[in-house]
UniProtKB/Swiss-Prot annotation:
The gene is ERVK-10. GO terms for cellular component: nucleus. Keywords: ERV, Nucleus, Transposable element. It is found in: Nucleus. It comes from Homo sapiens (Human). Residues 32-43 have a biased composition (Basic and acidic residues). This is Endogenous retrovirus group K member 10 Np9 protein. Protein expressed at very low level. This Np9 protein is encoded by a human specific provirus.
């Protein structure tokens, strides 16, 4: 096979690793902008419109494609 035959058809796959702070589900605030310990939580929207909360813990997002994502929460 020559190199031109080995090329994939379609858009290239993009692998991306994003690390951003987020509150675990059990600690998500009932009051907007505050967590249960009185700290401030910043909310924003991701690339695909998902909600991301920033706090003292970390969430690792492994992006496989534009619409498929794997989320791992580490605290």
């Amino acid at each position: 096979m020559n190199p031109s035959e080995m090329q994939r058809k379609g858009p290239p796959r993009r692998w991306c690793l994003q690390v951003y702070p987020t509150a675990p589900k059990r600690q998500r605030p009932s009051r907007t902008g505050h967590d249960d310990d009185g700290g401030f939580v910043e909310k924003k929207r991701g690339k695909c419109g998902e909600k991301q909360e920033r706090s003292n813990c970390y969430c690792v997002c492994v992006e496989r494609s534009r619409h498929r994502r794997l989320h791992f929460v580490m605290c």
